[in-house]
Amino acid sequence: MIDEFNGITYLVIFIIHFAGYAFYAFRCVLSTKAFVDQYGMGDGAAIITRFFGGIFVGSVLMALNIMFIRSEGLEGSWAFFNLIFLQNLCVFLVSLFANRQGSLGTNEKTSIEGYIAPGVLTLLSALLCYGLADKIYWNLILCK
């Protein structure tokens, strides 16, 4: 498995990235009340919180599929990794943009986690796209 990920470094980055996704999936879907209370969002935010948690669940399941089940492993999985990177980047940029737009959604419980977590996830997913390029873009290289 280590060779599949071009060494231990990218395997660890993959595990850390999707462990973060699994953490937020759990918090949003199964621990919704504690999550919305932690950030002072109120019970009305539960539905949309679970909606976004569901997106994390799907990504974690796909990552587990690529890691353990898919016969090709990482080969040709460029669309998944690029989608993950773009989602992370968009969440990071939107959080920065929203911060500049004013105080909507901020309260005494708001933390910088809303900026830091997407930034870290964006960096990790960019590293995965770069470090695994020879594997994930394999089918695209053969088509040329």
Show where each model-derived region lies.
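Hydrophobic transmembrane helix segments
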Residues: 16-48
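Hydrophobic transmembrane alpha-helical segments in integral membrane proteins
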Residues: 2-21
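Juxtamembrane boundary at the C-terminal end of a transmembrane helix
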Residues: 127-144
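Juxtamembrane helix-break-helix junctions at the cytosolic face
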Residues: 63-82, 100
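Hydrophobic alpha-helical membrane segments
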Residues: 80-98, 118-124
